[in-house]
Amino acid sequence: MSRSVLQGFWLLMRADKPVGSYLLLWPTLWALMIAAQGLPPWHITGIFMAGVFVMRSAGCVINDYADRKVDGKVDRTKARPLVSGVVTEKQALGLFATLVGVAFLLVLALNWQTIVLSLGALALASVYPFMKRYTHFPQVVLGAAFGWAIPMAFMAVTEAVPAIAWWLFAINVLWTVAYDTQYAMVDRNDDLQIGVKSTAVLFGQYDRLIIGLLQLSVVVMLLGMGQYLGFTLSFYVGVLLASVLFIHQQRLISGRARQACFSAFLNNNYVGMAIALGIAGHYFM
């Protein structure tokens, strides 16, 4: 296999842009710590961390495969490997299958209930890229895909998925819709021209307002979770930091400039980190 194809695989997997993996990792760590009420078993943590990278990579590959006919019409994506021809469609599908196979091998080291749940993750990752052709809410499907590690984490650690796991899952879906709408605002003009659907297209001039309401809902639900679980001050400091970051993001997207919207999207890495540190502070301080 040529070096150019390997480089194309690297780009298809977005290995050069790790923020997507971080956005998937943080909620996974939230769930693992809450499920274990502290430090989760190392082997389970390692499996989930590896699984985050592998499944995010698989999702990016199948996303580019689904978008191969339209990416050439969008400024931001017209140089992607499938568009440029560096990687063929067959090679992309082979890479996707390989990554899914690796992810399945990882999950085989967990209990059978988690293995069954993992099928939901595969289904969500596979259908998400095609949703933008049929609905304005592909971001909701992405939120479910990014959040599916939460019930899996609880099942792996406790062999059950309690109500608080689904509460945390809902928080993650709302957060994902908010930040992926910011991401979709970058491509909105191109999407309108080629008929691609997204929440950014649907929300239109109300995008900032709805993103703000989603972010407010995330904060309120986090506070409710903290009260329910009896979290200490450090968690609330983390939520406060996340709230400040949300306000900063609102300022960034105020003019709807492409680069500013993308910067707001990237800033969500620190939101996830702040919440993770808040949860860790409760359990370890």
Curated annotation (Swiss-Prot):
Q: What is its EC number?
A: 2.5.1.39
Q: Does the keyword Lipid metabolism apply?
A: no
The broad enzyme category this protein falls into is transferase
Per UniProt, what is one GO molecular function of this protein? 4-hydroxybenzoate polyprenyltransferase activity
Q: Which CDD domains match?
A: PT_UbiA_COQ2
Name the coenzymes or cofactors required. Answer: Mg(2+)
Localization per record: Cell inner membrane
**From the record, what ranges are coiled-coil?**
none
Q: Which domain of life is it from?
A: Bacteria
Any Gene Ontology CC annotation: plasma membrane
A Pfam match? UbiA
Q: Which GO terms describe its biological process?
A: ubiquinone biosynthetic process
Reactions catalysed according to its record: all-trans-octaprenyl diphosphate + 4-hydroxybenzoate = 4-hydroxy-3-(all-trans-octaprenyl)benzoate + diphosphate
Q: Which residues cross the membrane?
A: 20-39, 92-112, 137-157, 159-179, 206-226, 228-248, 260-280
Q: In which pathway does it act?
A: Cofactor biosynthesis; ubiquinone biosynthesis
Q: Which UniProt keywords apply?
A: Cell inner membrane, Cell membrane, Magnesium, Membrane, Transferase, Transmembrane, Transmembrane helix, Ubiquinone biosynthesis
Q: What is its main location?
A: membrane
> According to Swiss-Prot or TrEMBL, what is its membrane topology?
Multi-pass membrane protein
Function, as annotated, reads: Catalyzes the prenylation of para-hydroxybenzoate (PHB) with an all-trans polyprenyl group. Mediates the second step in the final reaction sequence of ubiquinone-8 (UQ-8) biosynthesis, which is the condensation of the polyisoprenoid side chain with PHB, generating the first membrane-bound Q intermediate 3-octaprenyl-4-hydroxybenzoate.
Write out the similarity annotation.
Belongs to the UbiA prenyltransferase family.
Q: What is this protein called?
A: 4-hydroxybenzoate octaprenyltransferase
Q: Look up and give the organism this protein is from.
A: Pseudoalteromonas atlantica (strain T6c / ATCC BAA-1087)
